[in-house]
Structures are given as structure tokens and as C-alpha cells.
Amino acid sequence: MADTEGTSSSIPTSTNSSRHRASRGRGGRFRQAPRQVGANTADNLDAAPLMNPRGGHRGGSGNKRGRGQKEATSASRLQMQPEANFTFNPNAATFNPAQSVLFDPSVPPPTIGASTHSNQNSRQQEPSQNRRRRGGQQNTQRRQLEIQEQRGDSHPQNQSRQNNRNQLNVDRIANQQNKSVQNPSRNPGNSRRGQGARRREQKEEPLTEEETKILADKPLREGLVYLLENNKYECAICYTRITTRQGVWSCKTCYHIFHISTGCITDWARSSRDKEGANTWRCPTCQTENETMPYNYYCFCGRMRNPNFRVGEVPHSCGETCGGARKFGCPHPCTELCHPGPCIECKLFTTKSCNCGKTKKSVRCGSDQEVMCETVCGKQLSCGQHNCERICHSGDCGECTVILEQDCFCGKTPKEVSCNPCAHEKYSCGSECDGMFSCGIHHCTKKCHDKECGECETGANRIRTCPCGRNTLQSLGVTRKKCTDMVPTCDSVCDKWLTCGTPGKNHHCREKCHEGPCPPCNLNTSVICRCGTSKGVIPCDEYLQIMKTTGEYLCTKRCRKKKSCGMHKCQEVCCIQDEHFCLQMCNKRLSCGIHTCENVCHAGQCRPCLQASFDEQFCHCGHTVRMPPIPCGARLPVCSQPCVRPHSCDHSVSHKCHGEQNCPPCTQLTEKMCYGGHRVRKNIPCHIDSVSCGVVCKKPLKCGVHVCQRTCHGEECEKEGEKCTKKCETIRELCEHPCALPCHEDSPCEPSPCKASVRISCECGRIKKDAPCCEVDKMILSKLEKEEEEKSESDGEEKVVKEGILKRSTSFSQLNCMKCDDECKKLERNRKVAEALEVDTDEYGMNKLAPTISFPCYLKEMVRTNIDFVKSVEKILIDLVIQILSGEAYHDTFRAHLPAMSIEKRRFVHEYANFFNIASESVDSPPKRSIVLTAVRGKSHQPLVLISDLVNYKGALKTPGPAVIRKDIMDQALSKKEETEGLMKPLRCTEKMVVRREARPMKEITAPIPLKQQNQFALLGSDVDSDDEESNVPTTSNLVSSPPKDWWKDEEEGWQKVQQKEYVVEVERDMTEDEIEAAKKLDEGPTWEDQCDEDAPATETSSAIESPAKEEPVAELLE
């Protein structure tokens, strides 16, 4: 034992890495397979290296060293089983690779799984307590084997075995040293570090491209052998590789290989059998049914159970001749060694007859090639009368195609049938026979039959009773001798059962005994509809008619229940169904957008489209491929290569390969000419063919007179058949206005009244309006006629109006042909009075100096908080007044559109615009609500004091209540310079600058009412009040006096109720005596209060200027 321990090695000598992995298994048993090597053989012996559960070997009793030493110094740890057999060739210089240590399949699968590379992680995750327990059990087994070995050393047979063992260990050490020289990076030791390196070397690597090409060119059998020998075949269930030490099962149909040792195919078969509910299970790949459960591990040919792996042979094979049956009925068994996959074709030749058996030919045995000749088949067909006329063919000859004519029994309706054994027999056509009975008088009433018609139904021998059957002919004293003799009747009631009546209580025939069928029943029958909801009584004849047609009585009620699909209703009359199944086809478009749902109408969404293509799907450029199966409607695979489709431009392609039919438009910026050829536009995307420059087209139209006034466009200026509709621009001779008739091309203008708008006014210029030119001519003509008539009357000449007088008239050039009204007269009178009083007035007779201006608290608050906004609005209002008074505006109104602003700012604009007599209106919807200002000629003017000037008046903004400004006193106070500094300011600059005004005690003010500017000539009325009301020009009372109501009823702005402090109303009151005296002392001249009456002007001015406002509660206005 000492020599053995000194020279033995526990490292297997096989070059296959799987043997090393198997040798490191925990608790695994190994044995040598008996094999004949040569003529000189010794006893068979199994070499079983005892493995430590932690990866190291445990030595024998003579030498016990640590687990971390090298393999060369641990040869004594090899233990042998004396009862095992081993075949050894002493002449061999090295160890025979066929005698390698093999895996014993009798060991349970967990032992096998622990030695494979796929379960290394599970070994590391095993609890240390279980590893110690398992290691103790294995150590006990090793000790028992050592004792048995020591006891058997003195036996002669054991001594020879020991010598063989020594030689085996020497060969193993030599082989291991050769491996170490060839691969010095590999750790030959038995330490855990060496095992970790070997585990890293066993990492699964995918197939290379060269291996894939090799496997594609090889047959299935050779490809399976290559993958199994290199441990690269994967189980189709667990997706782990199958090693040479694992038990497998191979399908005989598809030749796929699955694990048995790890329980993959066994669990699959068990679940498949339970699911099918039969004694068979299906293959996972080809679905072939199998009866035998895959519990046992057999070789590929099925002869050897638990085959042992030998280096140089196909893994999982027995190494013997396959002997399997070949395809296509080849009688010769397979001569190859046990192998996976299908057997190769037989290489022998045999004589094979053609399908018709007339020609023989030598073909390869087991080939599926059919031998066919060029002669007619000639085999007898199934009819037994005709032969096959086809050329030599495979399979059955088929049915006879000869058409024969088959007669019926009565001979009325023959038919054509294909030749068959029964084609020569007659058949029954179903019509009445029309043959004669034996009496030769009556015709047969039977259907077409094969035998004779027989005896007459009314023969003397067949009828022996009366028609009702109650009395015999003998009792009635009548003897019939032939069929034509009358059948006697009795006097009793027929009483035969009729088909009408309720079930079980059918009616009886109430007629006397009679021949032939019973007459119709005159009674009624109670019926119940099929669904049981309707009952009724109908005549028996109607009941019989219903029974003949439908077979049951139906009511008219339609079922309204929904069917199983939940969409359609039953709609069946007299429905008796418990479950209403919808049998309509769904026919909805599936998710793929190509196919339709072929199921019956159902609830919910349709199933996804199950159609699939098994062809490879390529992208448009062919660079990217998607392997089958391809779901129906799947888009082309995403490709990262540039698009290779032809494009309309020469720019570089910036988009990738795509599946859409059209490429994205080219966005390269280019220069292109506009539609009309006016200019070249730059920075135009390439995909835009043409562009408009925005200039007027100005292409000549078909009329030859006008040009196109549309913006630069691409289509034709005029549609086909369209005429020019523009107005003729030829100048008229009389009024010098354009013709304005529809375009008449080069033809002269037709005489027509001129309808051009002309601005005319009265003599004083106050009244202005627009009128057609033809009407103006008539007015001027009538005026000239009157002037000529007056002139002729004064001179005593006849009235003569020469042609062309209108054009030479000075009145026509001024267009002041209208008459002045009473308002004009009143303004003229006021102007003259003002001139007499030396009062400064404007062109419309309005006083330029107003005595008092009162600004409400809200406007004062806006001035104090947002003076910039106040000045901007004030500038716009002043510009409007300047433009409307400058005479540049063609019309009497001028508008300005302010930008969008908040509701507080809009309220300020509405109130402040009233001081300018400018109308304001809110437009649009929040939050883009804005204001449109409208100034009117003759009404809108600038106030004497602007609200922005309040900052120049001391205390005007700080004093509570409205600010009332007295223009005449303020101007004098501001213009007077201070003589000395440090003295008290005059009283007029402090006390009389701002006056606190109280509201009227008898009137409740409910809404802010902006005030109008007072006019000291408002008391002057017109001579005729009715003329003033009918005037076209609005009077002072019609001026804009209150802002629109939208600023306090804006629901979208979300108003909050606030507490208004007070409302401002201008009220005229008399000054106290102290105030009058103080004013007289300060001023040299009289004040404005001395120029008018103290009572009437104030009252009438307020009533004339203030516009009535609707009294509404404050809360409602704010909401």
C-alpha cells in the first residue's frame, strides 16, 4: 500500500473537461465499464477516487495530509474497490482513454446535478450545516472502503490487482504532467483555488459564427454529435447545456434531446399526461404521443440502460451497432454505431416494381423514389366493370367516372349517376305510381314501388264493413261482388277521431256514416302559443292549417332580450330559448388591420390575430432581418442603416431605413422662385415645391384691362370659363368718377347712374352725410334750377339750364348743397351771443372753459397707485380728440382698439372716457377682453383739467371723497407767483382748491355715474323743440354719459364683493356768504357763479347732462 500511495494520482487522465467536472462531484460513485482492449487482458477493476465534499481528496490510513497540497504529493489518497473489475493492457505505454471513469446513472439525479457547471451557484448557496452532514456520511463510507482494502491485500488476486493499480496510477501521473506542460495556466492542484479556476473555464460560451456555419452544412445526425461531444447542446425545457454525465431522453420523431437526470422531460411528461387525461404524453417540440414515461435513461438505440461515457465515442451511446429500422420500409437495419438523430439511408440497391406492376427497376433501398412507367394502369376500378385508364400512378385508382342512366320503378324520372355496383338497379322517384290494380279499373295510389300494384283497395274481399266500421255488410244485408259496387252506409254517427281539439281530447266526426275523408270540423280549438304567454280559441279548420304549415301555434310577441354578445337582440317571434346565443359572424377587423374575426359574435374585444408568417422578414434595405414566426400585421424590423430608397433631390439622406411607404420630406434649406416669378425666396425647405412671396400677382387677366389682385399664387388667376368681375375704371365725363360697372373688356361704357359715395354738408358745415353721386346731381340741379328761377324772375328772363352747368358750379365743388336745420340756426345764434359776451367757444359753439370737474374716488385711487397706466390711457384719449377735431378723418367717428387688460383697468378706461365724451365698449372674452374707444365729431373734446394734473394740486389725492376742481380759481392761483418765501400760502390755494361735496340725501345712488362737462349755454333752447328731436346730429343729452355695464357684470373675472365707501354725483349747491366774500377779495373780477342764475342753470344743467342710470343693488352689480 505504501508504494501504491506514493505513485497514484487522483486526477483523471481523460482530456475531456466533463470528466474533471464529474470527478469533483460530492458523494458521486464512479466505476469502469468492462471493455475488451486486446488479447492480453487482466481482471477488470473499478477505480473510484474518493472525493472530499469541499473539493479535496482524503488520503488512506498510511498518509493523512491537508486538503491544500498539490496533486503530485497526494497520490496515496487514491482508494480502490477490490470487488470491481478492470480491463488493463500491460503492453500499453499510456492509459487507454476508453477506460476513463464513468458516471453511474443509478445514483439519484441530485448527485449528478451537483457536479455540473449549471449548479455551481446552488452548491455555493447550500447551507454549511448540510455540507458538514453530507461530508461526514462520505467520510464514513471511505473508512469502510479502506478497511476492506487493507483486509484484501494479502490475497494473491488482490496483489495482482494492486500491481495493475500501480501501473494505472503511474500512467495517470504522466498524463497529468503532460497536461500541465501544455496548459501551465491551469492549476493542477486539488485546492479550492484550482477548482474555482476550473469552474471559470467551464463557463458556457455561445456558438461562434464558424461553428454555426459548420452546423448549417452538416446533416442533423452529425450536428447533434458535434454539439454533444463539445457539451454545447441545450435542453429545450431548462435551456441549460447537456453534459456527457447526465441522463437524457431522445425523441424518435424530431430527435430532440432532453434531460432525465434533472427531471426536465419527466416532469413535462407527467404534467402533459395529467393535462390530456390519458395514458399518453406529448413531446415538447413535435407533439408526438408517447405511452412510456421517460423514467429510465437509455442509449439512442434503446438497447443499453444507463450507458457509460467513453472517450472517443458519441456521448449517451452504447458504442454498439444501432440496428434501427430505416425509413420508407427498408428491410436492412442501420449499420452505424449507436447515434443520435435519424439513421442514414441504406446504400444497398434493390429491385422495385412500378405502381402498376408491369415494370421493374433497380433503385436504392429505402429510397422514397417512386418507380413509374409510361403505360396505362389497367387495374379494375371499384365498380367492377371498368378498368383504370390513367398512366401508371401511385395510390388508389379512385372511383369510376363513367356516367350511367338509372331508371326508377315507374319509369317516369330517370337520372344520371356515376358508375357503381348499384348503378344498374332501379330506384323509387317518390311520385305516384299511376299503375292499375288487378281489377283493371282503379289506379294505384302508392308511391313509386318495385313490385306489382296488387289487389284493388275497394275490392269485395277487402271491404267487409260499412265506412264507420260498426256494422258488417252481412248485417246490413248487402253483398258486394266487385270493386265498383257501392259500399253501404249505416245510420249511426261516424265518430272517427279528428286531428283537431286539445291533445288527449280530440274532436270526433259528427256526421253520419260516410265514405271518404271526414268533412272539416265546425268546432273551435283552444291553443297555447309556444312561449306560453298567449292563449286563445281558433276554428278547427284554421288550427289544421297551422299544423300543416308551422306545426305549432305562435303568438306575435317578439323577444327583446339581448343575445350572448350583448349587442344584438333576439327579435324572434314567440321565443322559447333559455339562453340566447348570437350566431352571427363577428367580422370585425382584428388588431393586425388585415384579417377579420371569424368567430361568432361575442362580447368584449376580439382575440389577437393568430395568423403568422414563417418567412424571414427583412427591412427595406435588407440589412436587418427578423426571424420567423412573424405575427400578422407586424411592422418591418427597426433598422439603423440610412435609407437607400431613391429620392427626388440630391441632398444627403438624414433619415434611417423605415417601413413607411413614403420617405420623410427633405428639410434642407434651399432657394426657390415664387409662384409668379417675382422674387427668389431663401431658406425654403427642399420638399416644398413652390412658395408665395406675398406680393400682389399683377398678371393680366383674360379681359386685357385688369390685372390679378390676388396674393402671389400657384394656380391660374381665372378658372376656365370664368369672366372678369372687377369694376370698370374708366372715368366718367360729367362727375369724373369711375364707371364702376362689371368689366366689359374693350367695349364702350354703357350710360348708367353713378353710384359713387359723395360727402355732402349743409351751408354751415354742421350736417354731413354720404349720398350717391346721382342723387347729389339731382339735389344740385334742383338747387340751381331754383336759383335760375329766382334770377329769371328778378330779371324777367326765361329759365334756362345749360348742359354742363353742374360741373362749372362752385357749389358742386364745395358740395354744401344741403339745407341748414333749426339746430344750425341755434348754434349760429349761440355763436353770435358768445361773440357779444366775449366768451371763448369752439367751432360747435361749446364753451371751452367748464366751471367744475369732479373726479370720483376710484379714478383718484388709480392715479395714486398706477400713474403710468393713467398717463398712457390719457394720451390715447387726447390723440383721439385731436384726430377727430383736426379734420383729417374722413368720417365723423374715429376708433382706437386698446390691448387686453384686467377688469380694474377697464373700469378706469370706461369712467375716464366719459370725461372726453368718448364712447367705450368691451369686446372679446376674458382673459383677452379689451376695449374699443369711439370718438364722435362735435361731441368728443378734451376736459379742461386732466386727471393726471391732480398730482400738481396739493391735497387733491389725499382728501377723501371726490376731487372737485374749480378751473378759474386754480389757474389764477397757480399763475400767481409767491412774493416772499416762508410766509403762509393764500387761502385760495388751500381751502378752495379741493371741495368736499355731499351726495343728494333724497336719492339712493346704486352705481357709479360719471359726470359730463357743464356747458353754460345749455340753457339756451331751440325755437322749435320738435325740430331738435328730429335732427340727424345728436344733441348734448344724447352724448355718451355712462360706461358700459360689462365692467361690473363680468362673470368670468370672478368679482369679489367689496365695500364701496361712497359714490360720486355732481350736485350744484350755493356757496356760503363767507366763501363768496373770500372769493371776491382774492379775485379782481367776478367768478363764474356770478355769470349765471344760481337756481336754474345748475338744475337744468344737471338734468341735461346726466344720463339716467338703471338703479340696481350694489351687491348684484359686483357679483
UniProtKB/Swiss-Prot annotation:
Which compartments is it annotated to reside in?
Nucleus
- Extract one GO BP annotation from the record: negative regulation of transcription by RNA polymerase II
Any one GO CC term of this protein is: nucleus
Where composition is biased (Low complexity), the residues are 7-17, 84-98, 157-167
CDD domains, per the entry = NF-X1-zinc-finger
> Keywords of this protein's UniProt record, alphabetized?
DNA-binding, Metal-binding, Nucleus, Repeat, Transcription, Transcription regulation, Zinc, Zinc-finger
* Membership in a protein family: Belongs to the NFX1 family.
Identification of the protein by name: Transcriptional repressor NF-X1 homolog
